[in-house]
């Protein structure tokens, strides 16, 4: 019955990404969390990313499926090919809908696009490493990258 509604296995997997993976752990979820840095008038981008990493650490199986689909998505015939090709732009556009508290030295959110891209790239790499042996702690590993991507002293009061 489910396949009749969805069509095929690839469409089911696509729905898992678009309707589940992308639907949770969002900036809105962070804003509603009340955690430090989640002020809707200016959220902390590094704090949001820590929230996202912690959230992703709780859904390892889904994250693993996402990584497999992302790899398969290199094929132009894959149903998620266009999605993964556009993902950096989609993430940028989505994050740009929110107010972020960014250090003046950075020049505001409009100058954050390369940093957002680097964060996505670093997270992809850390998540791949997280799936391998010996085990690492996803969150602790992200914190090491955070210090490099959001250096002191510029980001000290914006974490």
Segments predicted by a language model, with ranges:
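Amphipathic alpha-helical packing segments from all-alpha helical-bundle domains
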Residues: 40-43, 57-61, 77-103
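Hydrophobic/aromatic residues within well-ordered alpha-helical segments
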Residues: 9, 16, 20, 24, ...
């Amino acid at each position: 019955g489910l396949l009749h509604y969805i069509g095929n296995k690839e469409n089911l997997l696509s729905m898992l990404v678009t309707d589940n993976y992308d639907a949770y752990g969002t900036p809105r979820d962070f804003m509603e969390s009340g955690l430090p840095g989640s002020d809707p008038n200016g959220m902390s981008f590094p704090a949001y990313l820590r929230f996202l990493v912690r959230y992703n650490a709780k859904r390892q199986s889904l994250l693993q499926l996402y990584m497999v689909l992302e790899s398969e998505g290199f094929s132009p015939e894959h149903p998620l090919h266009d999605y993964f090709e556009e993902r950096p732009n989609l993430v940028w556009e989505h994050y740009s809908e929110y107010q972020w508290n960014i250090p003046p030295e950075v020049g505001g959110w409009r100058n954050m696009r390369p940093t957002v891209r680097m964060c996505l790239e670093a997270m992809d790499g850390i998540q791949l490493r997280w799936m391998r042996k010996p085990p690492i702690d996803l969150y602790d590993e992200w914190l090491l990258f955070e210090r490099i991507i959001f250096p002191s002293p510029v980001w000290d009061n914006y974490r």
